[in-house]
């Protein structure tokens, strides 16, 4: 009211709004006059005199119809005073300052007592929910706030009389729909209760405006049947065109219009925008309250602050949760809203027979339902940015809008309102309610609304419209039920979200806003009626949704049952649209109905129409998925183009600022660890600066129970390969290095790397390629009559030199050139070696212990040896027993049993039995479980000999009589030749190739963007640590280690925290990864402490280790694309899978690529089997230039992209694949 606009009593006015300036007298030097003059000037008696002077209407005289020309003439004559109220105030010098606050309250109380009057018994006037209480509140608020100023606005100049036109919103020419925006929708009125039903407090007095309305009602004349009255003219208050008042007003309904005469209606129209002197005027603030002058900035500051208090609408898109409710009859034939489907991202339907939720699926819509939905939105009501906080208030405004847009009849107002306020039920209600289900109900619509109706002191935002009883008795909601008033209605404060809903609530994002879709058929409507509602802010409507999610959108569709409209399909259509990302973003940013219609057209452009033919297999629908992906790709490109065009033009659409800022920050803050700086050790310095500042958080982040579980799991995952490779390494090196050396090396290097490394999540361990190299170098030294351990010392020293040179030159960037072509060859070769070595060892067992028809007696055994005991190494003392009965068969059983148990536990991990977490635990511990089971089987068979693992007692080397913990660089038994000291640079370069490939590729896999590691990584620092520590390992006779791919990925997965707010059917997403150093230190320490379990380790048969070796070889082949393409050679083309390397490449060219890889593998196998086996890492390195230089001449870039692309992403689905399927690296 600060700008001088007098609020009209209700509905829109047919005349333009007149703003009356409030003249404020200038400040006088002395204001000591008594305040009685002001009281006399504004006395109620003076208002009564002004009103009572109105001449009474003589019913005997013929009535006259007034036109707009008469109203215009009346406004500009002396009978219609336009002087502001401030002109009647005393001169400024007679005013004095305000008395104290207590005196003002006492004077206001006396004024209340003077103006109190009993309620009128006549026809109820048009009430507004502000009243005197609201006026006093506003007056008190202005007094407490300090100062206000009215901006004078000149009234519009008089023009020629024209016929007034009334319109609300933006009516389309081609549709009778109504689109009401926030200013008008907020002020939508409601019909007040009659005076005999409205509660009156003792001592309360009506406001002057209510008294004036009552006097005007008492003077009302009989209604003329010839007079016409349009309800649209009174829907919005006139102040909606400018600054709307704080009160919500009640619209005049048909019954009240019939009770009033045409002259009264015209009189109401005329006076809504007039300046009626002395009637319902706010007090002009005294000039003494203004601290500064009229032009002083201090006086304008509070006014500017008040103008800034207007709340800005939130147009930022949120995550969505959609719920479809249909109008149904329960067992007692009472109508209620029943939830039949829901959307978080995909559709979930309630199965009618079992009342349980089905599996999430992509919603399939009929094209006709989409067209009907588009027509419904074009012709229905669209209420955008509606300022209501309760369901009754929203429902009332929706009903009134439907009446104004001629969708429903005025006499159906009560029935539609009762339908919208019916009780909501959900599938989980019956399951969770127990023996005492809660069924809140109410006696009538008025009682429900009354429970939600706050007092006027709560402010205009909380006011809820009420429904007048003078509408007459409403028609029954259902024809067969006369007691429709007693239906269960929506009641707030339900029993909250239930236990079943807690799991669903976890899957909904925190900032999600809900969409409620209400569809159904009712018997009392003649045509469908629809409304699309967007609230100005999300509100929590209790007992409406299955979960407590704030509601932002509502869609209502009611209509008769005899039409051809399928309300269920239409509700599914709007719900699917709201779950679509682009459409619900457009719904947030829509300014009118046309924006919604345009978004529907965009949705139709990206939709697929399937012809009405019978589909008898899923294979027939494969092309649909590919076509849909293509449409989505084009849709994203169009959206990206629009965003770029808007940003280039300097305009950013609402809701795009945040995404652009996030994208820009990511682009600017992204730091490529493989980018070369051009300076010596520049990459190493960057790694240290990037990673070491996070060292304190690396210790704090380990304080979580998930880290403890990861330590226990990865400990067994690291101990099993250490025992397996240690036993095989002892076999290959004739006991010079075995389990003891490998356990010590894993512990020491693991602790140092976890404390100093740039990526402490990498697990350092022994691998198959290093085992192959150790065997090749051992054979080379035996052939050249050289000491194997002394040669390893010089190889280690040269390894340190080469690593320093490589890190100084920032050579880690070369890992980008190692494509899956080389990785698959590497992994396939190592897997073949594992499988070959397993059966080769089994063949040796059958050779030493053949199946004979007759075996010698037990006395033939060597003295001092038991049947089922640990045998000494072949070089230690007497050889082990030979020709033992059942040894070969038991070894075969132990090997196959270990392999099958571990393999099927891995399959069980990816099955559908039990829960996802239970399957993961069982599958991840498959190797330890299989080892334990087979050891128990061997231990239970006491009369059959099996060769056991050789483990010394305590902290000792495997062969104490052959070596010590320190290896002399110049030789132990004889001097080491000097030429070999220099020539050791060649095997050092070869072992560097293996360490570089495995370490850098593993670090590259772990640091993928999809894994969401935030603290960064350091390729140069990690390579320097592993290479330097490998050089020290040579001095102590310990095996070289590298970053183990499978164990490192398993470690990262164990520390990954998945998001719980994932839509059912959507793929899991990573929330965070607990990047810390403590788990690596504890895992390495526990592996080191395992050396004290020598008595237990000595019980493990070597055949069990052969089974683990076979398991690692077979499982490594499953994730290699080469093995899948190899099988396609023997498969008809019609059975080929729908993979890019099949659909985008001709079959014979795909086979050519496969044969090239097989040729490389065959060449490497031949080299490995000869005396030149030491050179196989160099030949492996040659596959990199082969891929970069030769293959582009044979294949097109499009074919190479399909055949040699790194498109594997981490899979965290409970039913998905494990680490072996994701990696192209050897174990």
Swiss-Prot record:
InterPro entries with a match to the protein in the record: Anion_exchange (IPR001717), Anion_exchange_3 (IPR002979), Anion_exchange_CS (IPR018241), Band3_cytoplasmic_dom (IPR013769), HCO3_transpt-like_TM_dom (IPR011531), HCO3_transpt_euk (IPR003020), PTrfase/Anion_transptr (IPR016152)
Segments of skewed composition (Basic and acidic residues): 58-75, 480-497
A GO biological process held by the record: bicarbonate transport
Cellular-component GO terms for this entry: external side of plasma membrane; plasma membrane
Principal subcellular localisation of the protein: membrane
Residues exposed to the Cytoplasmic side: 1-707, 906-920
Compositionally biased residues, Pro residues: 1-15
Glycosylation sites: 868
Compositional bias annotation for Low complexity: 194-215, 435-448
Lipidation (S-palmitoyl cysteine): 1160
Catalytic activity annotation: hydrogencarbonate(in) + chloride(out) = hydrogencarbonate(out) + chloride(in)
Molecular function as annotated in GO: bicarbonate transmembrane transporter activity; chloride:bicarbonate antiporter activity; enzyme binding
Residue ranges, annotated region (Disordered): 1-255, 286-312, 428-497
Family under the similarity heading: Belongs to the anion exchanger (TC 2.A.31) family.
Protein name according to UniProt: Anion exchange protein 3
Natural source organism: Rattus norvegicus
Phylogenetic lineage: Eukaryota, Metazoa, Chordata, Craniata, Vertebrata
